[in-house]
Amino acid sequence: MPPKNLSEELFKPRFKHPETSSLVRRVRHHHPFLIHAALGGEHSVGWYRTIDRLLWAWRGLSPQEIVEVLSRIAASTSEHTDERLLDTVMGYRGGNWIYEWSKQGALWQQKASQNHDEQQAGHCWLQAANLYSVASYPHLKEDPLAEQAQLLASRAYQQATLLLPGELKELEFAIPGGSPVSGFLHMPPDARPPYPTVLMCGSLDSLQSDHYRLFHDYLAPRGIALLTLDMPSVGFSAKWKLTQDTSFLHQQVLRQLENVAWVDHTRVAAFGYRFGANIAVRLASLETHRLRAVACLGPVVHRLLTDTDLQDRVPDMYMDMLASRLGMSGTSDGTLRTELSCFSLKMQGLLGRRLPTPMLSACWANDPFSPEEESRLIVNSSSAGRLLKIPTSPARIGFDTALRDMSDWLLAKLTL
């Protein structure tokens, strides 16, 4: 008798769970055109989610595997929440986004459990973690199937890091007024503690298990540790809502690093990408004496939060994600836009004045989420600012070169 497919054991077909695109009740714009961002993916006609092939491939997924899973989703004839959108199959079954990516993740998990070579097994576990993360994407609240996929991603990631180079420690941080949060401290294999450390401030559509490549390829070779933390309302930080004090959780963690023996708390920098840059730059303003430097990638700190025309041009999924993080899934566009404007660091008075903290901001031309002036606003607010323009073609080479440049810059600031 053939062994049961692992995905069938983990997730049996179910039909009573809400479909992801139906969770946020907003007016849909159904953009009849293609939206492309080098970081942030491609929003094609016919898809609810933004298809972020570059970032998924950079994390380790093969382009062929990405196409294979997307093809299974696109070919489904099952009932959809919106028949115009391929990735809105209702129920946990073939063709459903979470089902298909989780099924692929389970295949790699099975490969990992059958592989007796530690290094190869570790890479299989990492592939599984990446696939489970895509299954959960964009990680909206009140999506129980996505939450299960997040849990599987975290477990697979912890299994992977047990077998791959370097060491990972899960750290718990007490947070005033609520539940503690957990972060992953990634420690470089060829260095001695206490380590200079980068505090990761990720995008709103990422999990902290998504950042292994940044650590392994860019920070670890430079002897730098990476501390990851889930964004408010996601993963291990799910009990915390995103508020105008966006940096609250990261600030509490930053203040407690002097109690973490493996971290040199006098040599800490922050790395923020997309909305995470909002947190990183805010920390530069509020915790100047605790941060050596801040590096930002495709930052979202002002324009997208205040410009309604720009908000109308980004994918519905992104605006849904913002509404979900803010706990505003059932409010009108007007109310959401008013609230978003309060998240602008310029409106908060935290940008536009000179900060002593060195800040680097990297950007792409014609980025729909982060115009170049967003990065200029950041670097002009630092007494030691630097603007880095990333070539859009070839995209992967430009991305890799930028990350190496940013890592060298961080190392220089951390070793002054």
Swiss-Prot record:
Pfam families: FrsA-like
Transcription as UniProt keyword: no
Broad enzyme group: hydrolase
Alphabetical list of InterPro entries matching this protein: AB_hydrolase_fold, FrsA, FrsA-like, FrsA_esterase
A molecular-function term among this protein's GO annotations: carboxylesterase activity
Catalytically driven reaction(s): a carboxylic ester + H2O = an alcohol + a carboxylate + H(+)
Disulfide bond entries: none
Keywords of this entry: Hydrolase, Serine esterase
Enzyme Commission number(s) of this protein: 3.1.1.1
Family the UniProt entry places it in: Belongs to the FrsA family.
HAMAP family: FrsA
Role: Catalyzes the hydrolysis of esters.
Protein name per Swiss-Prot or TrEMBL: Esterase FrsA
Lineage: Bacteria, Pseudomonadati, Pseudomonadota, Gammaproteobacteria, Enterobacterales
